[in-house]
Amino acid sequence: MRYPILICLLFIGIFSSCKNKLLIKAGITKGEINEKLIDTSGRTVEKRIACPTSFSRIPAPVGSFTAYLRALPLKPSDEDVLLFDGRSKRVFVHCGVIDMPIRNKDLQQCADSGMRLYAEYLYVKKQYNKISFNFTNGQACAYVNYAEGKRIQFNGNTATWVQKVNEDYGYDTFQDYLDLVYTYAGSFSLSEELKKVAIDSIQPGDLFIHPGFPGHVVIVMDVCKNASTGKRLFLLAQGFTPAQEIEILINMDEGKINPWYSIQYDVIATPQFNFTSDELYRWE
């Protein structure tokens, strides 16, 4: 469900409380971005962003969601985040943009971006039976139903699958399915569908979810660990409103490790939204 007016008000409120933080491209207040951690020539998440001293990325088994996220292609470092209509996003809070085009529809927003990355991973793995997301009313929307030619028919708050077209597991139809999910699922339904996990166990693919109408969602793109202390750091990515490409966020408050985030605070302060440390969720 889309609530552009409410989200706009939320956006204004967040930034009015950040009057001392100037958002500039590839930079922050409270210390510049740690250039030693950024390789502007890197064209994947792993190659673009290095770990801070004494940290190393946690293991990523071949074929895992972690490995998939690390290998996601990035746009050239000098390119902007694009909105769904082709305009540049004028708030620069990123150190990388995932090279994954979005459709010319104001649909793929924050929660949708997290769902898309997970769905894209499962689609590449051909694990079609695992691609399913719940609508806000709690009803499951399985990709295999859509691919088999069934379409949702609504009767009040109830939705049923009705055979309409021929079977098609092609990528365009897969994107049509995701458009349906984006329309009827969101931060609230994700918070009901996923399980909460302790931040000490944070891993790539987890989501910080603040459920609501509107709420917000960011996805954990990678995690590194200090073998001596056990301390973990993580990278975050987001979609936003209006719909935009998925961007890897900078950390405006911890310049020495920017763009990594630490788990030592109760509040996870991203540039455009604050989460609490107990709002971490995981796909089951």
Show which residues each predicted segment covers.
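Bacterial Sec-dependent N-terminal signal peptides
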Residues: M1-A26
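Cationic-aromatic interfacial patches
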Residues: N20-P101, Q108
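Extracytoplasmic/periplasmic, Sec-exported soluble proteins
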Residues: R57, I102-C110, V197-D200, G212
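Extracellular-facing segments of soluble proteins and assemblies that are Gly/Ser/Thr-biased and enriched
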Residues: R103-K195
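Extracellular structured ligand-interaction cores
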Residues: L107, A111, G205, G215-V218, ...
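...with weaker cross-activation on analogous glycine-rich loops/strands in unrelated enzymes
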Residues: Y171-S228
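Low-complexity, Gly/Ser/Thr/Pro-rich intrinsically disordered linker/tail segments
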Residues: R232-E284
